[in-house]
């Protein structure tokens, strides 16, 4: 379902009025009240989101590209087709019964590093949410250790949780989309950028330690 179809004035008014059926409908699309947020506040946030998504669509149509934040340019012709996004929505629906199909996705033209796969972007002021993935996924499903469906499902899970300011368990739920049991188990451990360093540093130092031990053994036997 497109954002314009879901985020209508009538639907948002029903949310403001506390309609249980409207709340259930939005919940299934990954839109739900934040902790401590009442129905009126939730409706106001949805209204800001609808405006932001509408402006994004209009700016792309008129200008061909927009820059939602410094260093990241989104192009109209780089929008991820619904058929490809649908791969990930199947996974989020199966895992969480949530289908955030209103979240726009784009293939990134910029290079963010050899190991970069994708990320979700959120603007707290306008409530705009979107995600970008490596352009290589336009033509292939796999890139290094990344799987296109898994990566998009991961970022869409983040997008659906944009109203929850909870860092501790966020990666746990996002990594539940992983096909690998190892990534599902360890993925939630990487909360900050320093966590991955704590995990990788001992692995990177292992060859050095082995070499030092080997040299000492050689001197002792000599």
Can you name each region flagged by the protein language model?
Residues 1-87:
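N-terminal pre-first-transmembrane soluble regions of secretory-pathway and organelle membrane proteins
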Residues 90-145:
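Active-site scaffold of zinc-dependent metalloenzymes
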Residues 120-124, 132, 150-151, 178, ...:
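Short, flexible helix-coil linker/hinge segments at the edges of structured domains or between repeats
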Residues 134-138, 149, 192-196:
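C-terminal or late-domain output modules
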Residues 146-163:
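Active-site recognition of the HExxH zinc-binding catalytic motif
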Residues 164-206:
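Post-HExxH zinc-binding segment in Zn-dependent metallohydrolases
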Residues 205-214:
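Alpha-helical transmembrane segments
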Residues 217-222:
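Pan-zinc metallopeptidase signature
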């Amino acid at each position: 379902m497109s954002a314009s179809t879901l985020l209508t004035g009538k639907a948002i008014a029903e949310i403001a009025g506390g309609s249980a059926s409207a709340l259930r409908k939005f919940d299934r699309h990954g839109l739900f009240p934040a902790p401590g947020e009442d129905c009126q506040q939730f409706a106001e946030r949805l209204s800001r989101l609808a405006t932001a998504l509408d402006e994004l669509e209009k700016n792309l149509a008129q200008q061909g590209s927009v820059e939602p934040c410094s260093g990241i340019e989104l192009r109209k012709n780089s929008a991820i087709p619904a058929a490809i996004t649908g791969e990930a929505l199947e996974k989020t629906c199966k895992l969480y019964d949530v289908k955030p199909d209103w979240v726009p996705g784009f293939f990134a033209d910029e290079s963010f590093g050899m190991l970069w796969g994708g990320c979700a972007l959120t603007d707290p002021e306008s409530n705009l949410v979107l995600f970008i993935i490596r352009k290589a996924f336009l033509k292939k499903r796999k890139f290094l250790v990344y799987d296109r469906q898994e990566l998009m499902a991961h970022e869409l899970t983040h997008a659906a949780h944009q109203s929850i300011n909870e860092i501790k368990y966020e990666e746990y739920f996002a990594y539940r989309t992983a096909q690998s049991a190892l990534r599902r188990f360890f993925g939630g451990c990487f909360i900050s950028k320093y966590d991955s360093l704590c995990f990788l540093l001992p692995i990177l130092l292992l060859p050095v330690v082995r070499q030092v031990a080997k040299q000492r053994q050689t001197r002792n036997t000599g």
